[in-house]
């Protein structure tokens, strides 16, 4: 039986990303990993990744810029948010897991298990 292949966007210094990656390996996933620090997502990549989804879900509410700009109260436009995320990869909620057109933001063991079935 072949291993499930996933695309994993992460920051190696992120504890949650490390836990998620270890969990994926335990589940037997074949991981293609992208370090968002070394290889940030371009505006067009973010637009493609977000697609029809709510762009606000991709914003990390823990990020300093998110709090400084009070994005919870005054969310940026989709275009502005995507430009900000492209220039500030830490503003992107992570990790991002992509498999067969399905996307998961953050780390949720049950959701990961379900996606890999």
Stretches found by the model and what they are:
Residues 2-27, 31-36:
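Local sequence-structure signature of Cys/Sec-based thiol-disulfide redox active-site neighborhoods
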Residues 36-117:
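Thiol/selenol-based redox catalytic cores and closely related redox-interacting motifs
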């Amino acid at each position: 039986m072949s291993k499930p292949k996933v695309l994993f966007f992460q920051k190696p210094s992120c504890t949650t990303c490390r836990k998620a990656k270890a969990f994926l390996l335990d589940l037997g996933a074949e991981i293609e990993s992208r370090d968002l620090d070394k290889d940030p997502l371009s505006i067009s990549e973010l637009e493609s990744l977000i697609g029809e989804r709510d762009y606000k879900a991709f914003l990390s509410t823990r990020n300093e810029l998110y709090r400084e700009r009070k994005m919870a109260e005054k969310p940026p436009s989709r275009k502005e948010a995507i430009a900000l995320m492209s220039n500030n990869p830490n503003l992107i909620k992570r990790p991002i897991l992509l498999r067969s057109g399905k996307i998961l933001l953050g780390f949720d063991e049950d959701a990961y298990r379900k996606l890999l079935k």
